[in-house]
């Protein structure tokens, strides 16, 4: 007679590990045996996957997740949600958060949410709040966080010790950071104001996307940009497969990065591509991803490969703005490249600015921003790591060209009809218009309250649905083949077209013919 199975209570970390194994094809039966639990428990974990991941992602401490065994909700659940949202935003900004500040804010949200009863934001409440969300520490002394040079030095020293201990090379050290991009904003002769564009009555927010850059410390492995737009399939994509885009494209109703998208990107894109790159360099498949404390970045325990060899590490809130590598001119260089590219394209097409603006699509912007990222030189990136890794070497043979300057863009403007007289001040405003745009949604107190109460912005969802209903244009093989024939005829007539260009089109024609034969064998 078999003995009764001993009751096993899993930690949150155990549940996360089980979820990862399930996503990788592990069976409920096998996992039940490994963890000494019933298959029903495994199925319950699968059922509550998103809830567990969301809870873990919002936690502040990996070590506490390894101890915590329940996700017991607060007695005041709406207040708890509002406080966590507020806390994460304050931490991301590097603002000081003390016990008294938390207590005062909790009292404000309690009454703003219209909650009943007596509420005392005591030290006991604060302790329970921290425990529920695995928050390591709250700065009780209310010290100033921004601009803390001592904290910068401490972090850099600790990080270098960590790198040495883990035996990591610069090739294995990565940074990722998000930014907002007003992709359709063009300069005006008179002014460039945040929220307005050159077309009267047009709101910049309607053409805002989130762009995330990721690269290693040498600048020799730049991953494809991760872009978040509002629609799952924007109209300009037509029948384009998103897998064939020059960026990794995701959608979110506000075009913001969120916890779910970041986790997908880490698991499905970052980890596999880093493994492939390190393998090609003959290096151990081990890497660290350095991140700031954005509310959209999950807990370190969530951002970890199955074998634990590729993982995330966080910059302290009080130093991120000072030393995060991509924030040291790298993202700014990419944006300047992008805007210079837009003006150059307009100049080449010879259109007036308004016509160019109307024709500019999100698909055009994705190709342009991908090119702009490609133009950022490895040496520009490696120099941005100097404060954290002063010993990093600049690779020989890499020429360093100064990033595109305002003067360079001004030269292009002088040849752009309608923009010849843009003032240097307005030009600089345009170039810097989204320099402080975060990649995550910053909520006001009233928005935090609505979200805590479960209210959503239905208009955004309806807008996305309306975009999705636009029919796609289908191009058949016969039509595509005719276009390539016409293009080849055109190239043959041009005496200055080089042979490689014609060969590319001929190869494309052969590919289309093969597709046509496979679809219609009788032709």
From Swiss-Prot:
Keywords per UniProt:
DNA-binding, Nucleus
Q: Which domain of life is it from?
A: Eukaryota
The record's annotation in SUPFAM superfamilies points to: Homeodomain-like (SSF46689)
- Identify the residues that the record assigns to the HTH psq-type domain, covering every copy: 1-52
The record, for Pfam families, names: CENP-B_N, DDE_1, HTH_Tnp_Tc5
> What residue ranges does this record give for the DNA-binding region?
28-48, 100-132
HTH CENPB-type domain sequence ranges: 67-139
- PROSITE patterns, from UniProt? HTH_CENPB, HTH_PSQ
InterPro entries annotated for this entry?
CenT-Element_Derived, DDE_SF_endonuclease_dom, Homeodomain-like_sf, HTH_CenpB_DNA-bd_dom, HTH_Psq, RNaseH_sf
SMART domains to which the protein is assigned, alphabetical: CENPB
Q: Name one GO cellular component term.
A: nucleus
Mark the transmembrane ranges.
none
UniProt-annotated location(s): Nucleus
Q: Name one GO molecular function term.
A: DNA binding
* Residue ranges occupied by any DDE-1 domain in the UniProt entry: 168-385
Main localisation: nucleus
Q: Which PANTHER family match?
A: JERKY PROTEIN HOMOLOG-LIKE, TRANSPOSON
Family, similarity comment: Belongs to the tigger transposable element derived protein family.
The name on file for this protein is: Jerky protein homolog-like
Give the species: Mus musculus (Mouse)
Which gene does this sequence derive from? Jrkl
